[in-house]
Amino acid sequence: VDRSIFGWEVPASMFQSLNAFFIFTLAPIFAFMWLALAKRNIEPSTPLKFAIGIMFVGIGFLVLVFGMKSSSGIQTGVFWIMMIYLLHTIGELCLSPVGLSSVTKLSPKRIVGMMMGMWFCASAAGNFVAGLIARATASENISGAENIFSLAQKSAFMDVYTNVGLIALFVGILLALFSPLMKKGMHGIN
């Protein structure tokens, strides 16, 4: 990653705070937006919000690929890294709070706790898949020292991110298409 922006070198540790920054910044906006849409009777259903979130994750990966392709060398500009964090956080805000709320609303009262546990197990499975993607795009050697990767490796990384992005988009579109059926199964709970 080319971490320089406007002549300033962005500390690598700063990337760890981007997700939290975007969540704190955007969560109130999303909460207000969902309420405003609900007042106008145009709030997306829970399954459609999930679909939108998954599509934002896919778009995030594809935007990163675009950024990688647009950079002349092997390094990707910091702007593109910030964009993937932003887009993935938007996706997360369409999924996580909505999902937790849905679990409590849709689960029978006596097993809400167990269903919340299942929600977090699904999140753990997602983190496992994220680890597989990270392994497929790792740029460290066995000793752990950074290894400057080649253009061929960059191309392989772009292939992985393109595939993940396209799969996420496909799943999001599929979920959006089936969301009316899923909404009917929710028996009016949104």
Predicted segment positions?
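Intrinsic disorder in cytosolic terminal tails and internal cytosolic loops
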Residues: 182-190
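Membrane-embedded alpha-helical bundles of multi-pass transporters/translocases
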Residues: 5, 9-104, 108-151, 155-179
